[in-house]
């Protein structure tokens, strides 16, 4: 089964009217957050964070700084290494009822050295559309700062 058949798309459709689901079920958004400077966040991530029904955050104490900085009032819940199995079940149930969930970590992309993979696994198994919203990436930043040839 290829990625498209599993319901994964690198880029989802976000309209002026809000986050758009194609299945009637909700949707899972993996939202990349800045890796150092809050202003490195993308407009698209900001829009999804504002329009999602709930934000699942690795550490709500850190994430509240990001949300407050951009005046985002979306309800937030914790989703971290120590609750990822149980919380994934709760979040999947919400998405099956039509809610959209945006996942953020302290810095970077959910699922890359951060919680996210279990929620993605359960969402896909439940037929929920999963979208990854790109942003700052430590590996690209390190490569461009290295002076190494990239061609």
Regions found by a protein language model. Give the residues of each.
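Class I SAM-dependent methyltransferase SAM-binding "motif I" and its flanking Rossmann-like core
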Residues: 118-151
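Acidic, metal-coordinating catalytic cores used for nucleic-acid/nucleotide bond scission
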Residues: 83, 107-115
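Alpha-helix capping/helix-boundary segments
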Residues: 61-63, 108-109, 138
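Structural motif
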Residues: 58, 79, 104-106, 131-133
